[in-house]
Amino acid sequence: MSAGAGAAVEAGFSSEELLSLRFPLHRACRDGDLVALCSLLPHTPRAHLAAEDSFYGWTPVHWAAHFGKLECLMQLVRAGASLNVSTTRYAQTPAHIAAFGGHPQCLVWLIQAGANINKPDCEGETPIHKAARSGSLECITALVGSGAHTDLRNASGLTAADIAQTQGFQECTQFLLSLQNHQMSRFCHNGTLSGGHESILPTHVSLGTNRKRCLEDSESLGVKKARTRVPSLDHAMPLANGEAEDDADRMHVDRECAAVSDMKNSSSVLNTLTNGSVVNGHLDFPCANQLNGMESRSHPCLTGSNGVSNGQPLSSGQASVSANGTEEPEKTMGINPEMCGSLHLNGSPSSCVASRPSWVGDIGESLHYGHYHGFGDTAESIPELSSVLEHTSCVRVEQRYDSAVLGAMQLHHGS
């Protein structure tokens, strides 16, 4: 029969009759006619299992997947049909067709049989894009549970969530967006964004009572964040990283600040005699500006190599006062005014770190010494040293207070 005669014969048939005559496998899969399919398969060459019809360009497997005929789909695959066969026109696999048709049972079976669920079609869309177009939350759930990528974009730059939102499927949109946000959050917290391995423990849990903070507490510009006070309940357990010790430190600082305030109100001379305070269990002599409210830390304070201050550095134009009330000659310390509170100035890692950059604001009110350079409260990490220094500092503050009062009385009475 010539091509013209064949065309004339086909022109006289309806599409239904033409489908039954020329594509009996396709018709059986469309109708779910398992008896007819099983009778045709033994006599059908394997190459005909991949034949495309003249209507949609689908193979029998695509027809079974689109209409949700799971039994026909299983028989075709057992007879040798391919799971990942792509159509010539749109490069769509049976998984694309099942997802777009909204048939999760066929889609799940294809996935379990080994179908590729991340293969794009001619538009760059994977099966999850097709499920989003049809609004099938069951198919989306099946695909996601099997490892489908929700962040893939089609040729138009749209993700599955974008397509679902465009089609008006709000439930699918919210589900896909929540998955994307959860995956991105877990991706960042586990450190895999920078090529690291996933963290086994949560980021806020530490295995010890070390007061040092990890590098994750650093800001993007390299400045270490101040240790903030975590609000706790009465029955809350102390944190594993030792932050519960901060309360005792702050109480000690408040007590010493109150003592300095009382001495400052006694006499103007006491403002010069009283030149020390205790910060975090260490004896720290503040600068001149600190005596006026104990607030400013813009001038450097010298600290000894053991973490205990040896005395108050004298700034330009300031003279020291001896115990008998006489002024000593003015001394000038050659200290870089830009240095920001190194814990140890000699032989420690802090001394090798550059001074505080000019673009960093006044962080003295929120950071104790040693915080900027990233080495934490080193001396506080040793419990024995911290206890000894705390006791010693209390005794020395009390002695200074008595000496200051005595000196003020002697100056007042002129003795």
Curated annotation (Swiss-Prot):
Any matching Pfam family: Ank_2
Record Gene3D superfamilies: Ankyrin repeat-containing domain (1.25.40.20)
CC per GO annotation: nucleoplasm
Record field: compositional bias (Polar residues): 303-325
Annotated ANK repeat ranges: 20-49, 56-85, 90-119, 123-152
InterPro entries associated with the record: Ank_Repeat/CDKN_Inhibitor, Ankyrin_rpt, Ankyrin_rpt-contain_sf
Protein name: Ankyrin repeat domain-containing protein 10
Taxonomic lineage of the native organism: Eukaryota, Metazoa, Chordata, Craniata, Vertebrata
Name of the gene: Ankrd10
